[in-house]
């Protein structure tokens, strides 16, 4: 039986490789390199474990695209997956019901690793002359309360997200100063090795929050002083501006903080991108928008007609997080108390958003920035005051020190 299964697996792999070569999509050398990076590294997972890690709903979405492009029958692939797993709430590691593997870890803390960005402004860095390169990527493990430095020497890092599919982290650096046009975007393995520059220094102004679209292998990020919403592939190719709220060569635009784009979230299934424009500090002029991911024919990033204003008059909205399953949008706000320095949410399930339905989930943060929703529907929040919180039934401090935290990534 084992030999029979091996023969079927190997035959399927060979058929797909030969098809790729016949269509001149890749080369033998590139295919072998991809195979080694996907399945033969010490951190690599076998295929079924990898699908559970990625999420079976994401696997189904990727397969839907492939079936549509190739005119294939999905009965024994994605249809079977949805009927036997997804529709039963079995999404993989992120689900309490498991996935292809039915065993679910009992300890929440043991399966949770929190990736944190130390922007370099805190008292943990005694030499303020080194701030421009004092940024770090840290990994915090709640079960052991241990902190590991993965990457150092970064220039004001701000946004980070994890690709479960590629087992890599992606992050933004604002640059040596927020006033200089020298921002950049990078990626690395989850242990901090194999650092790659995705968007080189100077190609963007001040990149802020970044999110990963694993299904399409895209990253999205906002450029604050650059006044835009950006998209590119995992390797930095096909870099596009989706939304442009002002022009750098117009001083009146650059100085208008209501044009500054900061937080971002993406919904691949519905085809939306969400973003915040925070406004001046503590000014109550913050807004949240959304638009289609694809620009309509005949339009540009600067004159899009499909941009929806969802919320306005917010204290100072910063980063976003979308619960795609339940269609709930979360955001941090670093505005003035009592409604600022808060964690908030609103339903975006319908075509029309009801502003009066927004909720404040927790208050009294110290300049909150990054946030991530975990598999228990708890929100991990990090703030510039040096604390990391878990917000569920209540608000709990899970880490406190003299670091200024910005972005948050999560591996479960």
Question: Could you say what each language-model-derived stretch is?
Answer:
Residues 121-125, 175-179, 226-228, 279-283, ...:
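Short glycine/acidic-enriched loop and turn motifs that connect beta-strands
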């Amino acid at each position: 039986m084992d030999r029979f299964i091996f023969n079927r697996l190997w035959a399927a792999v060979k058929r797909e490789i030969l098809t790729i070569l016949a269509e001149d999509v890749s080369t033998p050398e590139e295919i072998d390199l991809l195979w080694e990076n996907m399945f033969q590294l010490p951190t690599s997972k076998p295929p079924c474990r990898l699908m559970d890690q990625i999420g079976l709903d994401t696997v189904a979405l990727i397969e839907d695209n492939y079936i549509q492009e190739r005119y294939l029958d999905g009965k024994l692939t994605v249809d079977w997956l949805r009927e036997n797993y997804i529709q039963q709430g079995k999404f993989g590691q992120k689900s309490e019901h498991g996935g292809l593997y039915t065993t679910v870890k009992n300890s929440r803390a043991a399966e949770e690793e929190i990736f944190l960005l130390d922007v370099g402004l805190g008292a943990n860095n005694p030499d303020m002359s080194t701030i421009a390169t004092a940024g770090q990527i840290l990994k915090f493990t709640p079960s052991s309360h241990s902190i590991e430095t993965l990457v150092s020497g970064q220039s004001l890092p701000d946004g980070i997200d994890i690709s479960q599919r590629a087992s890599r982290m992606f992050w933004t650096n604002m640059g040596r100063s927020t006033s200089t046009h020298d921002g950049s975007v990078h990626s690395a393995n989850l242990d901090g090795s194999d650092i790659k520059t995705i968007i080189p220094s100077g190609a963007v102004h001040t990149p802020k929050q970044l999110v990963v679209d694993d299904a399409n292998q895209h990253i999205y990020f906002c450029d604050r002083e650059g006044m835009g919403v950006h998209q590119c592939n995992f390797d930095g190719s096909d870099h596009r501006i989706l939304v442009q709220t002002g022009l750098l060569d117009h001083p009146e635009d650059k100085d208008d903080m209501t044009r500054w784009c900061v937080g971002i979230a993406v919904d691949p299934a519905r085809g939306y991108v969400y973003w915040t424009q925070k406004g001046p500090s503590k000014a109550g002029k913050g807004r949240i928008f959304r638009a289609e991911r694809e620009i309509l024919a005949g339009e540009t990033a600067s004159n899009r007609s499909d941009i929806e204003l969802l919320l306005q008059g917010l204290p100072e909205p910063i980063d976003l997080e979308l619960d795609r399953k339940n269609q709930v949008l979360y955001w941090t706000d670093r505005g003035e108390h009592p409604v600022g320095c808060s964690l908030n949410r609103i339903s975006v399930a319908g075509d029309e958003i009801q502003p009066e339905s927004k909720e404040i989930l927790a208050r009294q943060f110290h300049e909150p920035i990054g946030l991530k929703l975990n598999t228990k529907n708890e929100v991990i929040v990090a703030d510039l005051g040096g604390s990391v919180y878990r917000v569920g039934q209540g608000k709990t401090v899970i880490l406190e020190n003299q670091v200024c935290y910005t972005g948050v990534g999560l591996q479960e």
